[in-house]
């Protein structure tokens, strides 16, 4: 995968859409490319939140521990970002992310991610919108489950 392809993938992530292409190129260049085999974990629920990941290729499952059993709650695909919530809240990982297929991702270090938020207010707004959207979906799911 080329640097330009990685920049194109980053542009598909809502919170990175309005960032200057030169900055995205720098972000892609400084981020670590990580390959995960099917079944391999990006991180485990409870781990320290030290990075966010953008899925470039492949799929990953989001699972949570419930009474000692891992329960899949979502599936993520290409151009999805994961791990940013723990960085923003400075709390341990709230879920486990497992590669559902062979997956390639960009690992964005916590320090770099937080610097981007500081430098680009529009990214901070996009992050807030994404988190609000997730909360809204979760509330709807909870309401549905109670019926």
Model-predicted segments: where are they?
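Cytosolic regulatory regions built on CNB/CRP/Popeye-like sensor folds
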Residues: 1-147
């Amino acid at each position: 995968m080329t640097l330009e392809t990685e920049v194109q993938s980053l542009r598909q992530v809502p919170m990175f859409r309005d960032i200057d292409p030169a900055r995205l190129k720098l972000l892609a260049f400084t981020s670590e490319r990580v390959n995960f085999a099917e079944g391999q974990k990006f991180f485990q629920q409870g781990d320290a939140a030290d990075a966010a990941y953008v899925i470039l290729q492949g799929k990953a499952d989001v699972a949570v521990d419930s009474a000692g059993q891992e329960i899949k709650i979502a599936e993520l695909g290409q151009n999805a970002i994961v791990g940013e919530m723990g960085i923003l809240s400075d709390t341990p990982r709230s879920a486990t992310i497992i590669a559902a297929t062979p997956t390639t991702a960009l690992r964005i270090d916590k320090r770099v991610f937080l610097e981007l938020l500081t430098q680009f207010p529009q990214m901070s707004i996009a992050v807030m919108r994404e988190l609000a959207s997730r909360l809204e979906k979760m509330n709807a799911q909870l309401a549905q489950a109670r019926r």
